[in-house]
């Protein structure tokens, strides 16, 4: 039986196990909660709310561990989660939860999307990016394509050449739909605490506004491997990358907000195989874009390469199916 003592605004509570809590400035509402509490956690939350948060976090981790151990795709080892068919790099818990949800609902499309996304993200040498990107993309409602790339947006300026654009900040980049835009990773600021710094900037549809740093809006595909900084505390959903692929011009609504690029366009059918094949097969001398497999523990080059080629192959197969369906309609 708990013992409760109140002296003015000071309340002292002794729980059944002998643990004693005391706190000043207790309100009448809080005191009534203490007196009428059905469980000790309700009392502890008033005196030490951080303890309840820790307990809830522990419970959440235990529940996640239980789900992972029942999974046919993920593994729980040494308090970390792994997707062994992809790599031996630990999977962020937010992504793991999404994979488990898709597995529970037998959603093969999402499972393939998540596998492809994680395959590409494993190529990112920055641990912060690997840990935070999935959370960031979901937080700011980016669309993740089946191939694992994600759709992002930016504004650009026109040039004197039709169909060729440039960045508003420096007017030095050649930007054209269907051509990779790249910046050496070493020239980018990888500090995720810096929201606006060196690198190629891409944004969520909820952040970008008409005429903000450019008069023309573009939808772009970005490889998770190329992201260099994910501002964890960003309030507007902008990140930095070292490469992106412009895929189309976009429109804005009457409020100057992005009209999101439609998902059912088949855009990945033509562009993604090119990016992946050229990225893998390119050499230092002749490739504008390369997919580097980082030399980090947990990455097996052959396994990652096989998964990359499978992504490209599946996209090509789907392209052929779409073409056949279109021809049959005609």
What is the meaning of each model-derived region?
Residues 6-7, 15-17, 28, 167, ...:
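Acidic surface patches and DE-rich sequence motifs
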Residues 79, 85-87, 183-254:
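ADP-ribosyltransferase catalytic core
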Residues 55-57, 73, 79, 92, ...:
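Structural boundary micro-motifs
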Residues 8, 15-18, 154-161, 220-226:
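Short, flexible beta-strand-to-coil junctions
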Residues 276-330:
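Long, compositionally biased intrinsically disordered regions
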Residues 1-124, 133-140:
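Extended, charge-biased low-complexity segments
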Residues 2, 94-195:
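ADP-ribose/NAD+-binding catalytic cleft of ART/PARP-like enzymes
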Residues 221-294:
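Long, compositionally biased interface segments
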């Amino acid at each position: 039986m708990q013992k409760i003592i109140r002296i003015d605004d000071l309340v002292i509570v002794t729980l059944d196990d002998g643990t004693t809590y005391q706190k000043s400035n207790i309100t009448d509402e809080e005191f009534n909660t203490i007196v009428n509490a059905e469980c000790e956690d309700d009392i502890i939350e008033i005196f030490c709310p951080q303890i309840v948060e820790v307990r809830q976090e522990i419970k959440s981790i235990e529940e996640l561990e239980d789900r992972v151990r029942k999974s046919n795709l993920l593994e729980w080892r040494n308090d970390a989660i792994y997707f062994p068919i992809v790599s031996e790099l630990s999977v962020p818990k937010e992504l793991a939860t999404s994979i488990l949800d898709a597995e529970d609902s037998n959603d093969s499309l999402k499972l393939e999307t998540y596998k492809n996304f994680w395959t590409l993200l494993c190529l990112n040498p920055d641990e912060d990016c690997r840990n935070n990107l999935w959370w960031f993309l979901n937080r700011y409602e980016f669309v993740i394509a089946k191939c694992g790339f994600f759709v992002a947006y930016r504004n650009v300026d026109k040039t004197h050449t039709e169909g060729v654009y440039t960045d508003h900040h420096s007017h030095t980049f050649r930007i054209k739909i269907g051509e990779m835009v790249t910046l050496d990773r070493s020239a980018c600021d990888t500090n995720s605490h810096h929201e606006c710094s060196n690198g190629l900037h891409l944004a969520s549809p909820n952040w970008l506004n008409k005429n903000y740093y450019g008069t023309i809006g573009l939808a772009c595909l970005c490889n998770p491997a190329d992201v260099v900084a994910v501002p964890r505390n960003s309030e507007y959903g902008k990140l930095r990358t070292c490469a992106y692929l412009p895929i189309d011009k976009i429109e804005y609504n009457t409020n100057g907000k992005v009209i999101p690029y439609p998902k059912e366009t088949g855009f990945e059918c033509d562009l993604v195989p090119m990016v992946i094949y050229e990225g893998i097969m390119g050499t230092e001398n002749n490739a504008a874009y390369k997919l580097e497999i980082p030399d980090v523990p947990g990455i097996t080059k052959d396994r990652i390469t096989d998964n990359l080629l499978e992504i490209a192959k599946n996209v090509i197969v789907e392209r052929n199916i779409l073409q056949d369906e279109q021809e049959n309609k005609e």
